[in-house]
């Protein structure tokens, strides 16, 4: 079983990293690209514009000689030039409010994105640790809050309640003939910020930036989608700058009819595409997942991606205690937050326990405690969310509605995991109570995004819960210097470690649907990535600098699971039989060979 092989796989992963045996991209000279634009038009097309990177002969062919400064720069030189300007911006904004600086950085990157996509993604890949927090969490939350004011040019597609009956034709307005990856939101629950309506489009854009940078999906084959069915955010409805439909959200069948129509339209035009649902409110996150997962190739990142990343971290905490992975069945876990992410994490963890112990999922819930805004969920609760019913405890064990600190003191859990979206809810009293945990190395996961919504900071966790804890968060925090001179390692338990690999592996396997087996394979692969030595130090997740290698490994694991589940139909010239005959190393090599890398293609004009 996978669980028994994690230590061995960790050593193999470490060896691969140490000896550099695999490269996650190709820098071979690409073939020519046919374009139908010339002159200034080509300079205004971010897919093909090279700025000062056009060779002189190409400038002649495309009629742009004299429209650019005479010096020809390589992509590397252009990257260096951009980074120099970016560092200058950092120096010039020192002392400014954090939000002001974050938005200034985002604007600078966004202007490059709008002008030259190849250079944008080269800069992003080469500086992923610095720039991921700007184009993705946590800055993307700030961008969404201000998107109507920040909007300058369109990116992605918008399908609204006013477009009912027109989507099958609208989908052909997208200029790219092929789309591989779609990320869609309805804006109803953007990170921990609530209903942001049409302004939630920033989330699909940021997610797809990570698909390109981490998974090597060709940027000309990605599509951000905003389904605007209205908003219940009165502040937005009263804002004259708001760019969305100014009406309350559609509900019930009216809502589902809009999403049904979009899904039919998208898969009619691009039947091989993979669709990722993102930041839907809990009832629709679960509802649409169950509605579409067996019909279309789709998954929900909040429910399944977050769960996979959390499960990988939870398995790591067992290893950090010096215990075998099989001891996960004995871990007591308190989950704070019963939304789509919280329930998704709890469900996947329970499934893992059931699988390990050979028991039913109902029996496997014994050591899981779910807390929502009304306290501990028990069988006394009325109007309980259907997804939470399985985890309701007997009130004879702990009273209905018990607070977090009550539950922690009573249960003495090995893990306290937060997906509540409530900043600071793990206060000093709660964190100090974790000192009495039954674990020799208690784990605290503050996974809510953005940073202001994190259940606690890393500094507070190590200060109040003790220096021997394992800490993970959804947004980035700096490592903490402890009083004994050691370092309290901060792990970013972010979905970026999984969703790019899930999407890439699904795409290259040609899977008809995304199965639980594929998702579990992704999680187990991530769990096995770190060495025992790293885990003993409290390091559960790898450096984001290795994101392309991580994604290749996860993608290969997903592909192999698709083959095992007999749903892989192949991709391009690689058929299902070819996939089934691939070794583990073959699948990783196959994945890496198909990862796009930003280099300038020679452009050839045709009328």
From Swiss-Prot:
Divalent metal cations. Prefers magnesium or manganese. Signal peptide: none annotated. Keywords: Metal-binding, Mitochondrion, NAD, Oxidoreductase, Transit peptide. Expressed in leaves, stems, flowers, and roots (at protein level). Present in pollen. Its EC number is 1.1.1.39. Its main location: mitochondrion. It comes from the Eukaryota. It catalyses: (S)-malate + NAD(+) = pyruvate + CO2 + NADH. Optimum pH is 6.6 for homodimer and 6.5 for NAD-MEH heterodimer. In the presence of coenzyme A (CoA), optimum pH is 6.8 for both homodimer and NAD-MEH heterodimer. Disruption phenotype: When associated with NAD-ME1 disruption, loss of NAD-dependent malic enzyme activity associated with an altered steady-state levels of sugars and amino acids at the end of the light period. NAD(+) binds at residues 189, 302, 449. It is found in: Mitochondrion. InterPro entries: Aminoacid_DH-like_N_sf, Malic_enzyme_CS, Malic_N_dom, Malic_N_dom_sf, Malic_NAD-bd, Malic_OxRdtase, NAD(P)-bd_dom_sf. The active site is at 136 (proton donor), 207 (proton acceptor). The keyword Metal-binding applies. A divalent metal cation binds at residues 278-279, 302. One of its GO terms (cellular component) is cytosol. Pfam families: malic, Malic_M. GO terms for molecular function: ATP binding; cobalt ion binding; malate dehydrogenase (decarboxylating) (NAD+) activity; NAD binding; protein homodimerization activity; zinc ion binding. PANTHER family: MALIC ENZYME-RELATED, NAD-DEPENDENT MALIC ENZYME 2, MITOCHONDRIAL. Involved in the regulation of sugars and amino acids metabolisms during the night period. Belongs to the malic enzymes family. This is NAD-dependent malic enzyme 2, mitochondrial.
């Amino acid at each position: 079983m996978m669980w028994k092989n994690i230590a061995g796989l960790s050593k193999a992963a470490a060896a691969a990293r140490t000896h550099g045996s695999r490269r996650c991209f190709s820098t071979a000279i690409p073939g020519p690209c046919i374009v139908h634009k010339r002159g200034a038009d080509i300079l205004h097309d971010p897919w093909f514009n090279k700025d000062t990177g056009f060779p002189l002969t190409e400038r002649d062919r495309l009629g742009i000689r004299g429209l650019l400064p005479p010096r020809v720069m390589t992509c590397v030189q252009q990257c260096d030039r951009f980074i120099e300007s970016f560092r200058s911006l950092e120096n010039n904004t020192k002392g400014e409010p954090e939000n002001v600086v974050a938005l200034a950085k985002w604007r600078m990157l966004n202007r490059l994105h709008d002008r030259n996509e190849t250079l944008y993604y080269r800069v992003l890949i080469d500086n992923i640790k610095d720039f991921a927090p700007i184009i993705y969490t946590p800055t993307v939350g700030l961008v969404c809050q201000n998107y109507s004011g920040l909007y300058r040019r369109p990116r992605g597609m918008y399908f609204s309640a006013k477009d009912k009956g027109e989507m099958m034709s609208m989908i052909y307005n997208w200029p790219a003939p092929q789309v591989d990856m779609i990320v869609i939101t309805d804006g109803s629950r953007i990170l921990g910020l609530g209903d942001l309506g049409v302004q939630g489009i920033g989330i699909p854009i940021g997610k797809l930036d990570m698909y390109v940078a981490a998974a090597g999906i060709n940027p000309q084959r990605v599509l951000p989608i905003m389904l605007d069915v209205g908003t219940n955010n009165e502040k937005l409805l009263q804002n004259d700058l708001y760019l969305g439909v100014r009406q309350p959200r559609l509900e019930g069948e009216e809502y589902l009819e809009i999403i049904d129509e979009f899904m039919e339209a998208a898969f009619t035009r691009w039947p091989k595409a993979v669709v990722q649902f993102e930041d839907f409110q809990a009832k629709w996150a679960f509802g649409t997942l169950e509605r579409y997962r067996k019909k279309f190739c789709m998954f929900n990142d909040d429910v399944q991606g977050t769960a996979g990343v959390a499960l990988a971290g939870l398995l790591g905490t067992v290893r950090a205690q010096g215990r075998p992975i099989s001891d996960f069945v004995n871990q007591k876990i308190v989950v704070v937050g019963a939304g789509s992410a919280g329930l998704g994490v709890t469900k996947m963890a329970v499934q893992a326990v059931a699988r390990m112990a050979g028991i039913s999922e109902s029996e496997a819930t014994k050591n899981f405690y779910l807390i929502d805004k009304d306290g501990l969920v028990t069988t006394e609760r009325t109007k309980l969310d259907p997804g939470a019913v399985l985890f309701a405890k007997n009130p004879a064990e702990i009273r209905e509605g018990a607070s977090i600190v009550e539950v922690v003191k009573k249960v003495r859990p090995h893990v306290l995991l937060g997906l509540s979206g409530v900043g600071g809810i793990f206060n000093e009293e709660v964190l100090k109570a974790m000192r009495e945990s039954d674990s020799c190395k208690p784990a605290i996961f503050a996974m809510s995004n953005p940073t202001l919504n994190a259940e606690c900071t890393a500094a507070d966790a190590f200060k109040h819960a003790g220096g021997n804890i394992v800490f993970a968060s959804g947004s980035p925090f700096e490592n903490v210097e402890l009083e004994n001179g050691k370092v309290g390692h901060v792990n970013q338990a972010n979905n970026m470690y999984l969703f790019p690999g899930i999407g890439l592996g699904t795409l290259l396997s040609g899977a008809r649907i995304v199965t639980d087996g594929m998702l579990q394979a992704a999680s187990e692969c991530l769990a096995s990535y770190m060495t025992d030595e790293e885990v003993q130090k409290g390091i559960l997740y790898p450096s984001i600098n290795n994101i392309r290698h991580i994604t290749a490994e996860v993608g290969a694991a997903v592909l192999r699971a698709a083959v095992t589940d007999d749903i892989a139909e192949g991709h391009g010239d690689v058929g299902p039989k070819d996939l089934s005959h691939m070794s583990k190393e073959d699948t990783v090599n196959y994945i890496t060979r198909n990862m796009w890398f930003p280099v300038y293609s020679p452009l050839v004009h045709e009328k």
